[in-house]
UniProtKB/Swiss-Prot annotation:
Principal place of residence: nucleus
Family per similarity comment: Belongs to the nepro family.
Region (Disordered): 437-457
Keywords carried by this UniProt record: Developmental protein, Disease variant, Dwarfism, Nucleus, Phosphoprotein
Protein name (database record): Nucleolus and neural progenitor protein
Pfam families membership: NEPRO_N
Record-listed Phosphoserine modification sites: S265
Localisation: Nucleus; Nucleus, Nucleolus
Cellular component, GO, one term: nucleolus
Superkingdom classification of source: Eukaryota
GO-annotated biological processes: negative regulation of neuron differentiation; positive regulation of Notch signaling pathway
Length: 567
């Protein structure tokens, strides 16, 4: 009936401990006072442990932990605080798989049968020795696991505070610090309850073993003092003071800058009161200046802005290209306009303040200096309400801070430094951030649509020209075949008056007969050559429609022949 224990693996370190196959309760006649005291103490401590394990606060904190890990898995998967928080989650999952709560609940329900018995009977029902040993073994394993959980919480706390000192993911790190602190406090209370449960439960085991011995774990002896069994981690968790990480890393100053403290609250309240008073005065002036003439009067609003040397708002001024234009404009004009808009969006902004920032960035010789300069630029952009530039510089500041710590450890990164400096300078001077904006993408789409609209009429013209050339070539081929056939039929009996209606004029003009006959022979030979060339050109046109030079030349020859014939 003993549980099989693999060599080299302690029974308390097993996730699933098999239950005993024998009966779970033993009836005791005339129980002694020591047994009654042990039963009462075990019932009390079991009830308190079950309440602490079923706490809704523990469930809520566990759900928050799982949600934080799930939502930040992609961007924080390689960060040390995130990995340490994963170890905390693994400890909680293993504690849940142990089914400690179910075992203690079963033990607690075995004692409930004694309440239904009358007081006159001196019979008591107690759990058997295998059941008590199983619960004791799970308590030992849970105490070891909770000590490991507390240690993981401490490591996560310290790593998160260290990461908070880098001024990266501040809100997330604060959430993790608070979450780990609450888990440490709550499970430390659960550990205390389990330690308090072990002592009366060990006394109950001795009484039950004396009444009816049925050992379940024969190769393992339960310790009488659980604190000695837990060893040094127990004393570190309960006796040793926790390190003060916030004061050592200067996190208090950072948090005081981000979140308002009591010393700064009077100043802030005074500033808000001054702002409210100014708004009230402006409202009074506006009420006095109102003119009621029965009709709405449009007041000209003049917005006056403070003059500044460096106006980064010019970055955001993009040329709006109208996609819908008249199709009567030439294609060359549209191309020139597109080129002007393209180059105008990339104009170099040479204001003094931008040049001063760029000069400072270029003079930075380390990531420490570069981070300071970027921080100043971010503060300036936020003061001028330049959100896009502040976000861009903030991302560069995060990268510079990470590389700054690598540089502090002795790593030389000159190429990285030059690359980041170049990208920042290009963004400030040439407005490279505009090229990747959504508005720029929309502008490019509208330009492409406009180009397509301009190109469509040309394609139509090309198709119509090809059709006309084909029709004309077909007509010339038919006319040439008809004339050649007629010429063959009337070759011998044709009269010169049919070919030349003005033959009388030719005869009167003194044209001799041999000359006319030679001309007729030349015309006949030309018609044959034209017919052959026409058929050849037709086959060539079917293969390649774009080659139209031959057909145009042939049609010119046919026109000359018909002009000579008088048709």
């Amino acid at each position: 009936m003993m549980a099989a224990v693999p060599p080299g693996l302690e029974p308390w370190n097993r996730v699933r401990i098999p239950k005993a196959g024998n009966r779970s309760a033993v009836t005791v006649q005339n129980p002694g006072a020591a047994l009654d005291l042990c039963i009462a103490a075990v019932i009390k401590e079991c009830h308190l442990v079950i309440l602490s394990l079923k706490s809704q606060t523990l469930d809520a904190e566990t759900d928050v932990l799982c949600a934080v890990l799930y939502s930040n898995h992609n961007r924080m998967g390689r960060h040390k605080p995130h990995l340490a928080l994963k170890q905390v989650e693994q400890c909680l999952k293993r504690l849940k798989n142990m089914n400690l709560e179910g075992s203690i609940q079963d033990l607690f329900e075995l004692f409930s049968s004694n309440e239904n018995q009358p007081l006159t009977t001196k019979v008591c029902v107690v759990p058997s020795q295998p059941v008590v040993e199983l619960v004791l073994m799970k308590v030992l394993g849970a105490c070891k696991l909770l000590l490991r959980l507390l240690d993981c919480c401490c490591k996560t706390f310290l790593l998160t505070v260290k990461h908070l000192g880098l001024q990266e993911f501040i809100i997330l790190n604060l959430v993790m610090v608070g979450l780990v602190s609450r888990l440490w406090v709550l499970y430390k209370g659960v550990l205390k309850r389990l330690i308090l449960l072990y002592e009366p439960l060990f006394g109950l085991l001795q009484e039950v073993a004396r009444i009816q011995p049925m050992p379940y774990f024969k190769d393992f002896t339960f310790p009488s003092d659980i604190t000695e069994f837990l060893g040094q981690p127990y004393f570190e968790a309960f006796k040793k003071k926790m390190p003060i990480a916030f004061a050592a890393k200067g996190i208090n100053k950072l948090l005081n800058k981000l979140f308002l403290i009591n010393e700064q609250s009077p100043r802030a309240s005074e500033e808000t009161l001054l702002g409210i008073s100014k708004k009230a005065k402006q409202m009074k002036i506006n009420v006095q200046n109102n003119v009621d003439l029965g009709q709405p009067v449009k007041n000209k609003r003049v917005f006056k802005e403070e003059s500044s040397e460096f106006d980064v708002r010019a970055f955001c001024n993009q040329l709006k290209h109208k996609a819908t234009q008249e199709t009567s404009f030439d294609f060359k004009c549209s191309q020139s306009r597109l080129k002007t808009t393209k180059y105008s969006s990339q104009k170099v902004i040479g204001t003094p303040h931008a040049k001063s920032f760029v000069q400072r960035f270029r003079e930075a010789e380390s990531f420490t200096q570069l981070s300071e300069e970027i921080q100043m630029a971010v503060v300036w952009c936020r003061s001028k309400k330049l959100k896009a530039q502040a976000i861009f510089l903030g991302n560069k500041l995060l990268k510079s801070n990470r590389l700054k710590h690598l540089e502090a450890q002795g790593t030389s990164l000159p190429k990285k430094l030059e690359c980041i400096k170049t990208s920042i300078c290009n963004h400030l001077l040439r407005g490279s951030g505009i090229k990747t904006s959504k508005h720029h993408l929309r502008q490019r789409r509208s330009q492409n649509k406009f180009l397509r609209r301009q190109r469509k009429p040309q394609r139509k013209l090309q198709s119509t020209l090809l059709r006309e050339i084909q029709q004309f070539s077909q007509g010339t081929r038919k006319s040439a075949t008809d004339t050649s056939a007629k010429w063959r039929l009337s070759h011998c009996t044709v009269h010169r008056t049919d070919l030349y209606p003005n033959s009388k004029q030719l005869l009167n003009s003194g044209v001799s007969m041999p000359v006319i006959q030679t001309k007729e022979k030349m015309i006949h030979e030309n018609l044959r050559g034209i017919h052959e060339n026409e058929t050849d050109s037709w086959t060539v046109m079917q293969i390649n429609k774009n080659s139209t030079s031959g057909t145009i030349k042939e049609t010119d020859d046919i026109d000359d022949i018909f002009a000579l014939m008088g048709v």
